[in-house]
């Protein structure tokens, strides 16, 4: 058995193998983080070895909490594990649910706690090559335009976040300021 994540089975939250949750499309908990510096968002391109959505661009980091782990602890852990980022403490922004086919017979059926981390000052990013093949900073509206033009290059969840939840994730300050 692999990593156990919190998933709902028969309306009860129980530990379930992460791969099984995706194969069966079970509703499960997830965590997503966006790191923002001024008007730019740090995005990552998922490693080619990932079992779903390899090579696609996603938000700064995303994962599933371990069975006994809080969402905020998970957010900090995954910033460190995926990107080598330490000393950044994301703030909780929003809980959302989505359902998306992610290829290879896998389904994301997630209840996601979304966090926003404001980067002030230098940030050392050292991507874990097992998780991330590339990173870049991109302006909010440039990201929207790129997703519109090349949707096949982005994960389903990033497109859902940007198109349906941007106001609650980023707040009006980033969205309005980015237009100026």
From Swiss-Prot:
GO molecular function: isopentenyl-diphosphate delta-isomerase activity; metal ion binding
Protein family membership: Belongs to the IPP isomerase type 1 family.
Reaction catalyzed: isopentenyl diphosphate = dimethylallyl diphosphate
Lineage, opening ranks: Bacteria, Pseudomonadati, Pseudomonadota, Alphaproteobacteria, Rhodobacterales
Cofactor note: Binds 1 Mg(2+) ion per subunit. The magnesium ion binds only when substrate is bound.
Binding residues for Mn(2+): 22, 28, 64, 108, 110
Record flagged with keyword Isomerase: yes
Name of the molecule in the record: Isopentenyl-diphosphate Delta-isomerase
Listed EC numbers: 5.3.3.2
Keyword Manganese belongs to the record: yes
Active-site residue numbers: 62, 110
Pathway given in the UniProt record: Isoprenoid biosynthesis; dimethylallyl diphosphate biosynthesis; dimethylallyl diphosphate from isopentenyl diphosphate: step 1/1
Alphabetical keyword list: Cytoplasm, Isomerase, Isoprene biosynthesis, Magnesium, Manganese, Metal-binding
Ranges of residues in domain Nudix hydrolase: 26-160
